[in-house]
């Protein structure tokens, strides 16, 4: 037997003790605040790693992930034992109601909250209310605690780098979090009751095991009883010649509370090579002796027996793997524990799990009279009390792939549908992102507008945040009014006016307000004169006149009224430059002419919690100007909310209109950068993706946006988005001829296929749909 395996087996040995209480059956000897435990004759520490999109990846991407995961296994230290644990935990109904459902507020909107809650409950039922978590535990032999801490610090750096290359990331968990894992397993349904304060427990003389142990624990021949539940530990006895990379995924997808662990014992390459060479020498010796016996019988043409030839070939192949293909030799052990409410259910679940393994040509067996050792092996203590080891290479071990699909379930986030692969809820908190702004992109009829309204309703019903909507197509008035909002129509024929030259205290935030207003006026004039037609001298005149009209206002320290566009045009007319006449003529229509809606003092009050700025009747000529002016006006409200400590959500439909002109696109980009600092999130929607992508500003905003909802896309748009966002061909399949409400969600570095549909019989659907005859 190899020295490394002998040493590992010796470290697993512990003096046998008959437990006289449930607490004594838990093999934790000592705990430290930094998450290190002494278990038996070993020290252990646990890291959590996040899931990645393996199931939804293309074949090439799967190969890449497979190689990267193999590199993770190769990087494991040879003087430690690794345990990869997948935990399936059913959501506690009380916790689910507290964290996922909207509480009633008695504000007249509880009917809609009830519909939302029912939608979430129905979707959660389809996913069996399961949460999957993944951990890796490393354990080493006893040594001084200072040396142990230094060792795990080095390992922490290596694990973070290795899993980081997989876009997964590994994070060490605290002592309290490790205890919580055991508490949630031993006491299912009581997850919310766990409390751990080490210093307080020491003062009160409370053993930490008292906080996590079940009410009772009794081991039988082939199962165990735990606090009114029944459990059984299985181990993988038979391995297929070619194991499917989906076997672990299929087992862990089983809709019960279960833990699946893969114990991995890496062997140093030098020792593994010596062992394989020794085996080759032994096989060659056996073949030579067999041939000598045949020669003594005058049988000089006999063929080497198949079993000996097979052993020689396999041993040589293994040696080549170790010496030429960067493979390492590993011992592996797969164990699984599942829990049920009754013994009958436990037996049925065991048969189902064994059938899943048999479909992949593998076999799981019950640990007879070893249930306690099996339980201590499968739980993330860092122990291995089962000796059913299988010799594997790195590639063979990497086939036991723990990854399935990325999940996004942020505490306190908003509901964005369900994961199309796992059917789990997608709960996203955009506020935690570096940039909370978002794009919703899709062709007409793909569900983009419904998703916008869905987000608006979610924010309105589950938070106290303010909502402002710039509505270019008159789509959002019904849902805004239903949620208690106000709709302000701005048109040449209305009495509502917005002065684009308004300055709010703090507007500039360290920047030059004159330069910013000059850019705004340039954008307005560009839309009147045509994109790219403003000369350098005309821009200089615009900037000079803008500074001049604000001069008196600043000298009066706010005692005078804000300047108007008509004041600005009068200043232009006083300029001696011949280009000034052209500028004044272009500005005449929007200052003195029939489209002078923005040449009046602001008389719009947008202090309602939900406000829609309806620009539908502005007409094609004035609508781009209206979009820019409305966004400029919203900035004042955003800054006011910032001072009050209130978050603001701003929604922009048909955002492609901003990118038709250079300066309006730059104004939007400026708001995109600044609103994050002001405590506001912008959400922009467009069906004309190709039109947007013609703008370098838009491409930059897309690439830097950390939240995207991509619905069904045209072929040309898919190709552009694939290049810009690095979306694989398999992922593109989710936005190719996709049904309404289906697509891809990108949040941070995660890309998840999603489904977000609203039942047709609900009032929410009638408020959100744009289908003629179905909307309110």
Report the location of each language-model feature.
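Post-Walker A helix-loop "phosphate-sensing" segment adjacent to the P-loop in P-loop NTPases
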Residues: 458-468
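Hydrophobic anchor at the beta1->P-loop junction of P-loop NTPases
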Residues: 440
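Conserved P-loop NTPase
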Residues: 725-776
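Conserved lysine of the Walker
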Residues: 448
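A short helix-turn-beta junction within AAA+ P-loop NTPase domains corresponding to the substrate/partner-engaging
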Residues: 484-488, 697-710
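Hydrophobic positions on the alpha1 helix immediately C-terminal to the Walker A/P-loop
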Residues: 451
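Extended, folded cores of ATP/NTP-driven motor/assembly subunits in large transport
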Residues: 1-405
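P-loop NTPase motor domains
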Residues: 52, 59-78, 89, 252, ...
